[in-house]
């Protein structure tokens, strides 16, 4: 029994391991370039079977806890390894021994409490290393990075347990593009620990407290170009000149991000910055000022020289006691050399006139996402304010009148670039006043419905994108760039109004087509962006866009953003890939050809009808059918005549004086039906013919040249023809009054021609001795 249980347990373990292995393999996908992705796949270990084909391996956000020597042994060509946000607590000494080609290694946010230099010794090609967020207290007992001669980006430290920086920690590193140290809970800093690095382009330092800030500052000031301080409480910071000593500063930019500061500590920070002789740029992002702007120096403090600072950037500054804020008059003297100022999303509603007048060197001012209105802007742009200002950005404020805004800026004589986008102007007056040197104007997202002469003629760049424009007809003779995307325009602007245009961006409008002639009319155009419109892919448009090879050089978003909207069967397809059928592309020619063919068919039908009497056939058929459809007055009708005589009026003498006399005076007499005598007056002649033929036992045709030429004889012959065809009888008797060729009888009377070919007909003899026999034969034929 125990043996059986043991076997069951072993089998269960094997099955469990096989399932886990198959699950690991299923969570990893690799492409043909060796890029393998297995992030967020619930992996418990590094998948087996990895080969030298793998070049990039992403296993972030899994449950991996252990890396063995064999896991990555075959990945000799691996260049990037991402293992962030797992549960890794152990890495065997030689786990990375075969990764000589590795350039990018991310081990951040795991559970590595001890770091080993043996991990990194084989990584001679490493340029990026991230060890942030692991619970180590120090960076190991020996130097970790001394063998990483190609390292450019290094990130180390954590928020809670990293408490000590030692001199050996960064030994061997001479140049770094970026060094990020999370020393939020730093308690000990060994002097000159960071001084060993000769040059750092960008140092990011996370520190909750400022206790060790000056010591670190002394070490990095001569090697760091951009120093960024994050998440630091400087409310009680105090600068001591003795702590810095003589320094040869290399710092050009100092950034404070998510830093707390007071009026007094800001003054102390400025004293610190005064030690950086080459400082050019100062930036405050997401900072909190716990003060009211009272930056007055104490009697013991000397006046601060701002040095060479040219750029000041403030973004999302939070001032809890905003309503008590001062006028900044104590800082006026420090601003005269500043050339670029950005104060963004910081609730600025006014720049005092005196401050504006002190900003004598200011060339660029960005007050985006604030509370500026025309009345306060007028005070800010007072006489002699911002005398050197060239660019003013007032994006997303509370401006509402273009006319007032333009008039307010007239005092700025050197102003050339104005961005007042994302304000709500809605309408535009017919005329406005602007500074004389205006070259650039941004009116995007201002809800305007039309553009007028308010736009200055001196502009070289105009942005009116994302509005409600359906027409652009301004004459701007100097305009070089026009941005008018996301409007409602249905066609390209008139090129004659924009003779100098180089760049036109008109994507996502209501344009359905444009032609070669339109583009050629823009003589100087170099760049056109017209994608995202609802193009009608007509044959002309397709021919133009697909045959012009040079068009791709002008259309910067070709071909991806040029899609057909119609015809419906090509909707959504790229214009360059659409091919229309011949019938769609040559519809006019096709319709014309069909009309010509139809005309020729009708003409041919007419000729054939005329040649073969088709019209006559139809007329006779119609008359016969009409006659057949007439209701009978009696269910049956008796034969009233022995024969109906059809003859030509020119043969009337022979019929009336010879034939009638011989037949009607015979004993017993024959009763003949003659049209002159027996037709009912007032009745339709066709009806008379049909009725007479139907009431007659026989129909006698007196054939002669006159008969063939007679129209009424033709009718009588016609209806006799129909009767022969309809009733299939032999009621017709043919008399040849004079010799006549069978060809003289119209071919349309095929039945009668057949009778003449198959049956004997009577011929009027010229010899009087034979005429008695003729009458005997005729009487016999009528009686038969």
From Swiss-Prot:
Glycosylation sites: 114, 199, 414, 442
GO CC aspect terms: cell surface; cytosol; Golgi apparatus; membrane raft; nucleoplasm; phagocytic vesicle membrane; plasma membrane; receptor complex
UniProt modification remark: Ubiquitinated at Lys-754 by PPP1R11, leading to its degradation. Deubiquitinated by USP2.
Intervals, Extracellular compartment: 21-587
Protein origin, superkingdom: Eukaryota
Annotated S-S bridges: 30-36, 353-382, 432-454
LRR repeats: 54-77, 78-101, 102-125, 126-150, 151-175, 176-199, 200-223, 224-250, 251-278, 279-308, 309-337, 338-361, 362-388, 389-414, 415-437, 438-457, 458-478, 479-500, 501-524
Record Gene3D superfamilies: Ribonuclease Inhibitor, Toll/interleukin-1 receptor homology (TIR) domain
Motif ATG16L1-binding motif in this chain: 761-778
Subcellular location: Membrane; Cytoplasmic vesicle, Phagosome membrane; Membrane raft
A UniProt-annotated Pfam family: LRR_8
UniProt cross-link Glycyl lysine isopeptide (Lys-Gly) (interchain with G-Cter in ubiquitin), position: 754
Membrane topology: Single-pass type I membrane protein
GO molecular function: amyloid-beta binding; identical protein binding; lipopolysaccharide binding; NAD+ nucleosidase activity, cyclic ADP-ribose generating; pattern recognition receptor activity; peptidoglycan binding; protein-containing complex binding; signaling receptor activity
Assembly with partners or alone: Interacts with LY96, TLR1 and TLR6 (via extracellular domain). TLR2 seems to exist in heterodimers with either TLR1 or TLR6 before stimulation by the ligand. The heterodimers form bigger oligomers in response to their corresponding ligands as well as further heterotypic associations with other receptors such as CD14 and/or CD36. Binds MYD88 (via TIR domain). Interacts with TICAM1. Interacts with CNPY3. Interacts with ATG16L1. Interacts with PPP1R11. Interacts with TICAM2. Interacts with TIRAP.
Described purpose of this protein according to its UniProt entry: Cooperates with LY96 to mediate the innate immune response to bacterial lipoproteins and other microbial cell wall components. Cooperates with TLR1 or TLR6 to mediate the innate immune response to bacterial lipoproteins or lipopeptides. Acts via MYD88 and TRAF6, leading to NF-kappa-B activation, cytokine secretion and the inflammatory response. May also promote apoptosis in response to lipoproteins.
Family: Belongs to the Toll-like receptor family.
Protein name: Toll-like receptor 2
Originating species: Gorilla gorilla gorilla (Western lowland gorilla)
UniProt lineage: Eukaryota, Metazoa, Chordata, Craniata, Vertebrata
